[in-house]
Amino acid sequence: MSLVAEAFVSQIAATEPWPENATLYQQLRGEQILLSDNAASLAVQAFLQMCNLPVKVVCRANAEYMSPSGKVPFIHVGNQVVSELGPIVQFVKAKGHSLSDGLDEVQKAEMKAYMELVNNMLLTAELYLQWCDEATVGEITIARYGSPYPWPLNHILAYQKQWEVKRKMKAIGWGNKTLDQVLEDVDQCCQALSQRLGTQPYFFNKQPTELDALVFGHLYTILTTQLTSDELSEKVKNYSNLLAFCRRIEQHYFEDWGKGRLS
């Protein structure tokens, strides 16, 4: 999208209030959605909750193909469709809602750096586990990803996706990594996040930002998703302040879930 077009979209978005019927689309929750997409969806849900903006979550088998970027989640607000956390944050900001306006320029740069860390390490590790770890691929990924579709389409779509992810892994230098090396990267990422969080309730003290939403989305999903082993979730559990952070956001922003899954 050109800068002129982006500015025009921002102007339109800013003139319209947030509607009550805003919708977030993701894949089927129980039987289809994978770890990385679930984490991305939860991050956006957390961000909108933190902004006090209502959104209805709708699960569709073809959500990935409905998305303008081919990635989930995406939101449908008025006549606008926006996908992924970064563009959604900018879209919401154009409507006058921002979680990071109170930060100075140095803090904003730091926030963006940590968000890059999460995307480069945690998200990539999730994709690696889903599509490059043979045990996970064989026992979980193929069956879940293709679950809405008949044979042989279910396998064709899954293997196409696996090929895409493996090509990406090779391009970024993760193609020859072992699972142990990936888990070590996750541990280093969690260590950096734990040190930055310290004893604060949120990464920038008392108020959450989009960084908090992103970290929560990934860590909470890692902690609550059943995989072929507990190795990934155990890396997160080594950091008590990250666990407390996830519980805090779950209890404060997702109280309608009832008894917390991290209790």
Curated annotation (Swiss-Prot):
CDD domains per UniProt: GST_C_Metaxin2, GST_N_Metaxin2
Keywords: Acetylation, Membrane, Mitochondrion, Mitochondrion outer membrane, Protein transport, Transport
Superkingdom of the organism of origin: Eukaryota
CC per GO annotation: mitochondrion; nucleolus; SAM complex
Matches recorded under InterPro entries: Glutathione-S-Trfase_C_sf, Glutathione_S-Trfase, Metaxin_GST, Mito_Protein_Transport_Metaxin, Sam37/metaxin_N
GO BP annotations, alphabetical order: mitochondrial transport; protein transport
Chief subcellular location: mitochondrion
Keyword Acetylation belongs to the record: yes
Residue numbers carrying N-acetylserine: 2
Pfam family, one: GST_C_6
Subcellular localization(s) per the UniProt record: Mitochondrion outer membrane; Mitochondrion
Keyword Acetylation found: yes
Task of the protein: Involved in transport of proteins into the mitochondrion.
Subunit structure as annotated in this protein's UniProt entry: Interacts with MTX1/metaxin-1. Associates with the mitochondrial contact site and cristae organizing system (MICOS) complex, composed of at least MICOS10/MIC10, CHCHD3/MIC19, CHCHD6/MIC25, APOOL/MIC27, IMMT/MIC60, APOO/MIC23/MIC26 and QIL1/MIC13. This complex was also known under the names MINOS or MitOS complex. The MICOS complex associates with mitochondrial outer membrane proteins SAMM50, MTX1 and MTX2 (together described as components of the mitochondrial outer membrane sorting assembly machinery (SAM) complex) and DNAJC11, mitochondrial inner membrane protein TMEM11 and with HSPA9.
Protein family (similarity comment): Belongs to the metaxin family.
Protein name: Metaxin-2
Gene: Mtx2
